[in-house]
Regions:
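Predominantly extracellular beta-rich ligand-binding scaffolds that present long acidic/polar faces
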Residues: 1-181, 189, 193, 198-201, ...
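Short coil/loop residues immediately preceding or within conserved phosphate-binding loops
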Residues: 184
Length: 211
C-alpha cells in the first residue's frame, strides 16, 4: 500500500501469488498515490471478500508493461483499476480467471498490444489491443514461476520491444525514463523467466513462448 505522492514502486520479474485480503480495495497492490511501474510481473490467484475488492487498485499513476494478471476470484470490481491519475498499459494480459471482470474503466491509456477478457466497455482499448473474451485460457497455474498460455489466431497484433519502450516513455517523461534505466532496455526484450522474446513479435504478458 502506498499513499504518499512521492512514493515509487518499481517492479521487474516479480510474482505475486495467492494474495488474500478480507476487506475492500487492493487485494495484491493498493496504491492511493505515487507511481507504480511494472514489467514482467505476474499476479496470480488472489482472493478477496470485500465488495469493492480489486486485484491491483488505486489512484496512483500506474504503468504496466509485459504484465499478467490472471486467476483472481472474489474481486467484483475487476483485476485492474486506475481510478485517479493517468495510467498506461502495454503488451499485458488481463484474464478473468475465476472472476467475472478484468479492467475497470478509469484513467487508463492503452499503449497497445494488450490481450484482455471481460473488460469494461470504454476502458481505453485501441486497435492493436485484442478482446479475448471469446477464448478459453488455461487454468491459473504456474510453470517455471510464470503463467503460460498459447497464442491463437484471434490475436493478429503483436508488440515490438521498441513499441513497449516507447509506451513506457510516453507514460511520464521523467518517471518512464527512470524505469527504463532501472530495468535496462534489454529487460523489455525478455520474459519474466529471463528467456529471450522475439523482439519484433512479442507475446502479451509476462510469459513469452518465442513467437
Amino acid at each position: 500500500t502506498t499513499t504518499a505522492a512521492n512514493s515509487f514502486l518499481f517492479m521487474n520479474n516479480c510474482l505475486l501469488h495467492e494474495n488474500y485480503a478480507p476487506t475492500a480495495w487492493g487485494t495484491a497492490i493498493h496504491a492511493g498515490n505515487g507511481y507504480v511501474c511494472m514489467n514482467n510481473v505476474t499476479v496470480l490467484g488472489t482472493t478477496a471478500t470485500g465488495g469493492n475488492s480489486i486485484t491491483v487498485n488505486g489512484d496512483a499513476y500506474f504503468m504496466l508493461a509485459n504484465t499478467t494478471i490472471v486467476g483472481n476470484s472474489g474481486n467484483p470490481n475487476g483485476v485492474f483499476r486506475a481510478g485517479g491519475r493517468a495510467s498506461t498499459v502495454v503488451n499485458s494480459l488481463f484474464a478473468k480467471g475465476a472472476g467475472s471482470r478484468t479492467i475497470y474503466a478509469g484513467n487508463i491509456t492503452s499503449g497497445g498490444y494488450n490481450v484482455y477478457q471481460a473488460a469494461d466497455a470504454g476502458w481505453g482499448a485501441v486497435s492493436t489491443d485484442t478482446d479475448y473474451s471469446s477464448q478459453t485460457l488455461p487454468a491459473a497455474t504456474l510453470t517455471d514461476g510464470v503463467y503460460q498460455w498459447t497464442v491463437t489466431g484471434t490475436i493478429d497484433e503483436f508488440a515490438t520491444k521498441q513499441a513497449v519502450i516507447d509506451a513506457v516513455k510516453s507514460f511520464d517523461a521523467t518517471v518512464g525514463q527512470q524505469f527504463i534505466n532501472w530495468v535496462g532496455e534489454n529487460g523489455f526484450g525478455v520474459d519474466q523467466r529471463g528467456v529471450a522474446r522475439n523482439v519484433n513479435k512479442m507475446q502479451a504478458g509476462a510469459y513469452d513462448a518465442g513467437l
